[in-house]
């Protein structure tokens, strides 16, 4: 059984703790080692009167049981005084439970100004005042847990409680924003809607129901949400009588009710009402970004359905003939010089690491095969979008605050030099009318002398400039391609650093959106977002690693569509499908499941002979029989072995010096699994050994450690895990 949850040394402030729920919270926290501030004004359930006896009785009860507590008798509107009591007595504040409340129930028409105001002051303003007083202290100590107390009345409404309902749902809105602002400082805020008997509810509930809904049936949820090991943040929970349920927002898929070059009408709303209100296949947005985001994907959908922006009498920003003069316009040529240092800086910015030995060629100029990552070719060309660039094109007026990077194509004609100077020539290839904006398609060619090294195509969306009657598609635009519908052939993951955007911007993209919290907030994001081209670089590196063994000479081209933003610190998961020399892929944020790069692919230069990344079926290899036997043996004892080993081993079996087959022994997930092919996720240890030497190890003729030190067995990753190989091969590989 797991150890009990303790709060030793934590300082907990509970408001309205003189009775009911607050008393139950205070006693429960104190029983588990917390230092408790028991706040209660001492008035009745209507907020009339005051006194010290209620808080004093709870403090005395805690002390009798061996706990530590102090009383506070101030109104929650004096939040600073409550927090000062905690600081003066115990020196810190870790947990705030906003529980204090009163009732002034009246039918709506009978609510007086006083009835309305006092409810807002105690419930909403009081919680604000107390939490604000504690906030900076929690930020400085990089820790805090906050509970807001809402109500079923606030969530669903209740007759006679308009004032109470408004305040209670307001607390949920307050909590939702505190979640966003407190996340970086490890401050969690959750909201509960309790059903419990108290001096407030005893006037509206039958006596036997009040008795059944004991506060002690709510307190355990509050304690769990306030414990340092609880990762829940931003949740809304109904709780009572020993039952707990979590709530979330749900939104219909809705309907688009406007058509190309036609006004939007109330009749169109009426005619689509059933679809607008249909919760089949509903979405469940978890943030304002999810609610309003995904604009590029939406615009592509609008484009494919032939739907345009709604004109309301405003003149379009330009006409087709005006933009026609822009198409074909050549921007001034420019040079991009770079050294090995810039190549290394870029590689680090897109996640290359010395933790992966095969990445050394990208981060160490002294490596025998030092190479520049292929996607650095975008860095070479991006100056065409900055430093004047598009802003100086005659006839093209752009508000760069409304520019979104929609798609990117890069093609290499030979590997990028490890250093040098490339001359770049840019041209406006086309302009498309997407109704609610325009898409500018720009081609950039980069030369070393007269030799073409790489070609970029930038597709940027400018919000609010469309509707001029121009064409919606272009044969010049490199097409994005949907990924296959089958499960991916390979998946790689990398967790980005909190400093990822700060590091990547050193490669030349200095947009403050990616570093300045204030600028990001103005743009509608809770914090600075990662560069889309940084995610692009991570994804391309995953494909190169998985299917080309980091051989940059095999990289031919890449096309991506940017779908959603990524926040530094999130985990990027690249899902890949191999079809010939084309690797389809999409990239997700592992924590949310959001697709951030979609309809993407990498084209590889074909190779002759056996491919190191696409192993044969392993025919005529003795090792295939052994792996099959290990798989059969693990079916009965897999879970026990997983507990002992807790690792994923990827095997590269060679024949005549070439990789002839790959196998994975997954002893980390579920009941274990053995399958042919690379690890579905990331392997903890990758082992390369010949088919003959593998059989020698299995038969006990060759010790794995001796094989490693003699060079006959090569391991990368966590090589200490290879010590467990003897147990695996000895016990489960007997033929």
Curated annotation (Swiss-Prot):
Binding site for (3R)-3-hydroxydecanoyl-CoA: 405-406, 434, 509-514, 532, 562
Chain positions of motif Microbody targeting signal: 733-735
InterPro entries the record matches: HotDog_dom_sf, MaoC-like_dom, MFE-2_N, NAD(P)-bd_dom_sf, Peroxisomal_Beta-Oxidation, SCP2_sterol-bd_dom, SCP2_sterol-bd_dom_sf, SDR_fam
N6-succinyllysine modification, residue list: 46, 57, 68, 84, 275, 355, 423, 578, 662, 724
Main subcellular location of this protein, as a coarse class: other
Keyword Lyase: yes
Classification via SMART domains: PKS_KR
Post-translational modification Phosphoserine, affected residues: 52, 304, 308
UniProt domain MaoC-like: residue ranges: 483-599
Residue positions, PTM N6-acetyllysine: 46, 564, 668
Subunit: Homodimer.
Function in brief: Bifunctional enzyme acting on the peroxisomal fatty acid beta-oxidation pathway. Catalyzes two of the four reactions in fatty acid degradation: hydration of 2-enoyl-CoA (trans-2-enoyl-CoA) to produce (3R)-3-hydroxyacyl-CoA, and dehydrogenation of (3R)-3-hydroxyacyl-CoA to produce 3-ketoacyl-CoA (3-oxoacyl-CoA), which is further metabolized by SCPx. Can use straight-chain and branched-chain fatty acids, as well as bile acid intermediates as substrates.
Family indicated by similarity: Belongs to the short-chain dehydrogenases/reductases (SDR) family.
Protein name as it appears in the record: Peroxisomal multifunctional enzyme type 2
The organism of origin for this protein: Rattus norvegicus (Rat)
Phylogenetic lineage: Eukaryota, Metazoa, Chordata, Craniata, Vertebrata
């Amino acid at each position: 059984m797991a150890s009990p949850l303790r709060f030793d040394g934590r300082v907990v402030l509970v408001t309205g703790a003189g009775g009911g729920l607050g008393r139950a919270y205070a006693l429960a926290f104190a029983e588990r080692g917390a230092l408790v501030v028991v706040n209660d004004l001492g008035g009745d359930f209507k907020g009339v009167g005051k006194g010290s006896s209620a808080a004093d009785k709870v403090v005395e009860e805690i002390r009798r049981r061996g706990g530590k507590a102090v009383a506070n008798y101030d109104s929650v509107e004096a939040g600073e005084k409550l927090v000062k009591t905690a600081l003066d007595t115990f020196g810190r504040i870790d947990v705030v439970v906003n529980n204090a409340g009163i009732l002034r129930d009246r039918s709506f028409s009978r609510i007086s100004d006083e009835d309305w105001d006092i409810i807002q002051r105690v419930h909403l303003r009081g919680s604000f005042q107390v939490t604000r007083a504690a906030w900076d202290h929690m930020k400085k100590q990089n820790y805090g847990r906050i509970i807001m107390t809402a109500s079923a009345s606030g969530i669903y409404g209740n007759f006679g409680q308009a004032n109470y309902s408004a305040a209670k749902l307001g607390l949920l809105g307050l909590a939702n924003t505190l979640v966003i602002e407190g996340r970086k400082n490890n401050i969690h805020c959750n909201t509960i809607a309790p059903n419990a008997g108290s001096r407030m509810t005893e006037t509206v509930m039958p006596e036997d129901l009040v008795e059944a809904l004991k506060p002690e049936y709510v307190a355990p949820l509050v304690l769990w949400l306030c414990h340092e090991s609880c990762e829940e943040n931003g949740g809304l929970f109904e709780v009572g009588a020993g039952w707990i349920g979590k709530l979330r927002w749900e939104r219909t898929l809705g309907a688009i009710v406007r058509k190309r070059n036609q006004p939007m009408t109330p009749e169109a709303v009426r005619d689509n009402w059933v679809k607008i209100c249909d919760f089949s296949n509903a979405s469940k947005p978890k943030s304002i970004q999810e609610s309003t985001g995904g604009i590029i994907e939406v615009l592509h959908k609008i484009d494919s359905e032939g739907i345009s922006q709604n004109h309301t009498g405003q003149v379009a920003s330009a006409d087709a003939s005006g933009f026609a003069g822009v198409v074909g316009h050549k921007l001034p040529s420019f040079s991009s010089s770079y050294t090995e240092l810039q190549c290394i800086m870029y590689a680090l910015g897109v996640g290359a690491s010395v933790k992966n030995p095969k990445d050394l060629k990208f981060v160490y100029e002294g490596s025998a095969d030092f190479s520049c990552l292929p996607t650095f070719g975008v860095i070479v060309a991006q100056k065409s979008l900055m430093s004047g660039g598009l802003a100086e094109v005659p006839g093209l007026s752009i508000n760069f605050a409304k520019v979104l990077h929609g798609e990117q194509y890069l093609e290499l004609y030979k590997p990028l030099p490890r250093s040098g100077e490339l001359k770049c020539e840019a041209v406006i290839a086309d302009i498309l009318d997407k109704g609610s904006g325009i898409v500018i398609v720009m081609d950039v060619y980069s030369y070393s002398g007269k030799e073409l090294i790489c070609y970029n195509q930038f597709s940027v969306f400018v919000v609010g400039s469309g509707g001029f009657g121009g064409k919606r598609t272009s044969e010049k635009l490199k097409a994005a391609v949907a990924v296959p519908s089958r499960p991916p052939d390979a998946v790689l993951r990398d967790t980005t650093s909190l400093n990822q955007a700060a590091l990547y911007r050193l490669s030349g993209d200095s947009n403050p959106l990616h570093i300045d919290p204030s600028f990001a907030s103005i743009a509608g994001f809770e914090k600075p977002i990662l560069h889309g081209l940084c995610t692009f670089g991570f994804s391309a590196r995953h494909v190169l690693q998985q299917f080309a063994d980091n051989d940059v000479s095999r990289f031919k081209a890449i096309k991506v569509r940017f779908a959603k933003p990524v926040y530094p610190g999130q985990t990027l998961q690249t899902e890949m499908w191999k079809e010939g020399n084309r690797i389809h892929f999409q990239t997700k944020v592992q924590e949310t499941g959001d697709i951030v790069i979609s309809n993407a692919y990498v084209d590889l230069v074909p190779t002759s002979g056996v491919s190191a990344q696409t192993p044969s079926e392993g025919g005529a290899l003795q090792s295939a029989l052994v792996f099959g036997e290990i798989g059969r043996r693990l079916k009965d004892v897999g879970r026990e072995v997983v507990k002992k080993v807790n690792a994923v081993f990827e095997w590269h079996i060679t024949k005549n010096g070439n990789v002839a087959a790959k196998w994975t022994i997954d002893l980390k997930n579920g009941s274990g699994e053995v399958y042919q092919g690379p690890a579905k996720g990331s392997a903890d240890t990758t082992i390369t050994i010949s088919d003959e030497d593998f059989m020698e190890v299995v038969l006990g003729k060759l010790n794995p450690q001796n094989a490693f030190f003699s060079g006959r067995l090569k391991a990368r990753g966590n090589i200490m895990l290879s010590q467990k190989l003897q147990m695996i091969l000895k016990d489960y590989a007997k033929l």
